[in-house]
Amino acid sequence: NLFTLFIFYEILTLSTFPLVAHKGTPEALRGAKTYLKILLGTSVGLQLIAIISVFSFAGTLDFTPQGILAGKVTNFQASILLALFAFGIGKAALMPFHKWLPAAMVAPTPVSALLHAVAVVKAGVFTMLKVGVYIFGIDFLKESGSSNWLIWLAAFSILSASIVAMTKDNLKARLAYSTISQLSYITLGLALANSLGVLGGALHIATHALGKITLFMCAGSIYVATHRTNVSELDGLGRIMPITFGAFLVGAVSIIGLPPFGGSWSKWLLVLGAIQADQILIVAAFMISSLLNVAYLLPIISRAFFSSPNKNHLNNGVGIQEAPLLCWVPTVFTAIGCLILFFYSGHVHNFLIPITN
């Protein structure tokens, strides 16, 4: 039920806090405080109020197909409750409660991969989907119109975070803002309040996880091999580290949403969901977002493979070699996962179908 989910949602926040503060530097401690302040503040100050309100209206917190709020709340009350959940589930990084995610990039790269690709952010959007499908109900969201405002806020988060990502020279910062954008795809899928949107959002949890963890682990491999953290410092490294940057290319193309990688299916379902909801402007937003994805990800690859090493950089690339075996092997496995998910996405789709019935 919703209360049990809330308890373990909070435990996840507390158990990952030491990982963010791991380095013990002033910057790491500041980032960890921001992480804890935003995630605990939103969950206790907003999400918990929403949960108590749901119980007062419905008399239960059990997850139920078709939801538990239909006929129990007015359309206006449903909109307010959804706002409390959308902003109270801070791990979904919906603007303006997104700043914990860039702050957490001070953590070691394996932790960043955990936070930004798999555990923490996915707990946020998973909770959003659970609340939308099993507390509100997709049909009730559509009939009440209570999620209409969320469509536009999520679209704003998608585009604005992508634009900010383009301005970041630090590789992990660029990937962090990319994550904020990609998470809002999932929230938007729910807000469309139809089966295709919810399926696309749910599938995007898996496709984004594989693509983004590949990118973060590649960033870690680059740092281990070169001690470089900025995009402007990567010129020519692709020819020295072809495996690492090859895996980065696969992850980037999957995030962009191009075949033959898994991200293409989830984005396609989201576009179909927007068409089904007669939201043509949202279809345009998806298209623009994919172009912005190209603009902030592919220049990293082009610099690495096609630019000459910058003479101002330390050692000018001399002495640098491919990342150690234990660094690049995991990136290759997750990159292959992006490919497998394209050809076998039907299995995931069949697994997810029951949530829309």
Residue map of PLM features:
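Hydrophobic transmembrane alpha-helices and their helix-loop junctions in integral membrane proteins
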Residues: 2-5, 14-304
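Cytoplasmic/organellar membrane-interface segments at the starts of transmembrane helices
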Residues: 239-244, 298-357
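Short, aromatic-rich membrane-interface segments at the entry and exit
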Residues: 4-7, 350-351
